[in-house]
C-alpha cells in the first residue's frame, strides 16, 4: 500500500506530489514536507499536522475518482490568523481544528463540492463542512469528532446510508435507525 498526495496550494501557488505512506508506515521526511506545504501562509508558520488527516484526504481523493490535484484552500491556521478570520466571519470556529493541525479546506477542480461532501460524510472519519457559495467553493475535512455542517436532511442521509448505520444526525435531530 503506497499513498501519494498531489496537492496545489491556492494561496502560495506551490504544487507538491509526495508519497507520505508506504507499507502501512508514514515517511517522516514526507510528513515534514507536508507540514511545511500546509503552513499558515499569512504568518509562514507550520505545525506538526495529524497524519490521519493525510490518510483521510488521500481516501477522499481516491473515492472521488479524480486524477486532478487537490486544491488546498487552508491547512494549518495559527491562533492569530484564526482570530483575524473570526473577526471577519462568523463561519470561523473559535476552537478550529485548523489550529490543531487536524483540518484541511479543499476542492478538486473536476469534482463538485456536493460530491466531496457526500464522500466525506460516508467516510465518517471526522468533520465535514460544506461551503458551496464561498468565492472558491470548498469542503472542510478534519479528523476531529464525526459531524457535518450544515447538517444533512434525513433524505440525504438515508441516500448515503441506506442501512441507517451512521453517527451523523439529520437536520431534524432524530438519529437514523442504525445509529
Show which residues each predicted segment covers.
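Active-site acidic/histidine clusters and adjacent loop/turn architecture
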Residues: 22-73
Amino acid at each position: 500500500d503506497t499513498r501519494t498526495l498531489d496537492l496545489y496550494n491556492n494561496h502560495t501557488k506551490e504544487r507538491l506530489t509526495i508519497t507520505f505512506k508506504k507499507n502501512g508506515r508514514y515517511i517522516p521526511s514526507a510528513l515534514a514536507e507536508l507540514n511545511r506545504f500546509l503552513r499558515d501562509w499569512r504568518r509562514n508558520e507550520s505545525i506538526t499536522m495529524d497524519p490521519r488527516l493525510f490518510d483521510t484526504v488521500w481516501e477522499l481523493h481516491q473515492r472521488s475518482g479524480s486524477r486532478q490535484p487537490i486544491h488546498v484552500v487552508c491547512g494549518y491556521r495559527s491562533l492569530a490568523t484564526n482570530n483575524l478570520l473570526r473577526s471577519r466571519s462568523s463561519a470561523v470556529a473559535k476552537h478550529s481544528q485548523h489550529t490543531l493541525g487536524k483540518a484541511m479546506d479543499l476542492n478538486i477542480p473536476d469534482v463538485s463540492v456536493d460530491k466531496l461532501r457526500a464522500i466525506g460524510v460516508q467516510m465518517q472519519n471526522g468533520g465535514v463542512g460544506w461551503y458551496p457559495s464561498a468565492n472558491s467553493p470548498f469542503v472542510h475535512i478534519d479528523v476531529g469528532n464525526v459531524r457535518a455542517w450544515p447538517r444533512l436532511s434525513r433524505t440525504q442521509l438515508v441516500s448515503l446510508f441506506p442501512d441507517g448505520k451512521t453517527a451523523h444526525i439529520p437536520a431534524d435531530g432524530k438519529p437514523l435507525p442504525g445509529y
